[in-house]
Design a protein with these regions (language model features):
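Active-site-adjacent elements of ketosynthase-type condensing enzymes
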Residues: 108-115, 162-180, 217-237, 301-309, ...
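Flexible, glycine-rich active-site loops centered on histidine and acidic residues
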Residues: 150-193
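Short beta-strand segments
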Residues: 9-12, 132, 157-163, 199, ...
């Protein structure tokens, strides 16, 4: 069973609510009051410069702009993307025997969101697996599904990823007395969305898209995290003396905020992604010149500079810019879901030609990981 051909039977994606234009972001997420004077004086200019450099024209948030109520959960976002993938595959949810859900923040610590998604889809019996991960959650989920399908343990797998960034970007989440620019950078980069793939083994015909491989690597040993959010079972060393529960202390110290080492990410993220992509292509015995489409969903266009183009040529040995359409500007950077959203959009638009090799690759700065997946497009697509 190890050499079974695994097909991509369908893809789906979902973006909540109406598109939010750049000049509406603060209105939807809410203005941050109570910032210190020095930060407040710099904030408007910093935000406008960052939003302009990103090139993102619109994004989506699961927030009702009038009532400020949350309109989705991770499970509901994933369900909508999954149903679209199942529809593309012409399958019922009951045919799925392996369900994989990935997200950086589950809806609750227990039960797992994967089981909540199973409930929503009405799958009476299946194996469900939840992966806690940021951007590399998609290739991790695909790799697990791919190996299990090839082993013959399962016949049909549904791989989903959901990113509900707005829960920790909205103004009500912040303790503004402990906010720095490093806490706010991602506020104007991230958005909400979900994606899904249906994978199946054997008997799908030679004209179906084929999932050739998935790849993940973690290279952050000895490096400090590039992104943190201290909500979990173990507080930081300086808070370890506190009795549990310590959630209030975490909030009062502002340690619940999403923080990113902006300078380190700016200097390392692109090389991390491109080096990982090189390793993946080598592992797949694939030449960079053979790839027809590169899906590389960075948070914004400011990650695509002359320096990065030169870096890509040096690491990959070829110029990939003409083969790397950057669609994040159209729908927003919804974290790990962005690769699936772009893949789904391009598949539905007929952007892939029979025989095209399509690679999607992402990097995750939390502890310096990266990963991706490789598809050979089929003549019949999902039909």
């Amino acid at each position: 069973m190890g050499n079974s051909r695994i097909c991509v039977l369908g893809s789906g994606s979902y973006l909540p609510g109406a598109p939010v234009a750049t000049d509406q972001v603060e209105e939807v997420l809410g203005r941050l009051d109570g910032l210190n004077d020095r930060l407040a004086s710099r904030l408007d200019q910093f935000r406008e410069r960052l939003l302009l450099r990103s090139g993102v024209q619109s994004r989506h948030f699961a927030i009702d702009p009038h009532t400020r109520r949350q309109t989705e959960t991770n499970a509901s976002l994933a369900e909508k993307a999954a149903r679209r993938a199942l529809e593309a595959a012409k399958m019922e949810a009951s045919e799925i025997d392996l369900l994989i859900f990935s997200s950086p923040a589950p809806d609750c610590l227990t039960p797992p969101t994967s089981a909540l998604l199973q409930e929503r889809l009405g799958i009476q019996r299946c194996t469900e697996i939840e992966i806690h991960s940021n951007c590399t959650g998609v290739p991790k989920g695909i790799q697990i599904a791919l190996d299990m399908l090839r082993q013959g343990r399962y016949a049909k797998a549904l791989v989903t990823y959901s990113q509900l960034s707005s829960i920790f970007l909205r103004s009500e989440f912040y303790n503004t007395s402990h906010v720095t620019l490093e806490h706010l950078t991602l506020r104007w980069m991230l958005s909400d969305g979900a994606g899904a793939l249906v994978l199946g083994r054997d008997g799908q015909g030679p004209d179906r898209p084929e999932m050739l491989d998935a790849y993940v690597e973690s290279v952050g040993v000895g490096q400090t995290p590039g992104m943190t959010m201290e909500l979990g079972a173990q507080p930081g060393p300086d808070l370890a003396h506190l009795p549990t529960p310590y959630i209030l202390a975490i909030y009062e110290a502002g340690r619940h905020h999403l923080w990113q080492d902006v300078s380190k990410v700016a200097s390392q993220a692109a090389e991390l992604a491109l080096s990982g992509l090189r390793h993946m292509l080598d592992a797949c015995h694939c030449d960079a010149d053979d790839i027809a489409v590169y899906i590389l969903p960075f948070p914004g266009q400011h990650f695509i500079s002359d320096k990065h183009r030169d870096m890509a040529r040096r690491i990959l040995g070829t110029d990939i810019e003409s083969r790397a359409p950057f669609l994040v500007t159209e729908f927003g950077y919804c974290g790990g879901a962005a690769s699936l959203v772009q893949f789904d959009r391009m598949a539905r638009a007929g952007s892939f030609k029979p025989g095209d090799l399509v690679v999607a690759y992402v990097e995750e700065s939390s502890k310096w990981m990266s990963g991706g997946f490789l598809v050979r497009w089929g003549a019949n697509g999902f039909s």
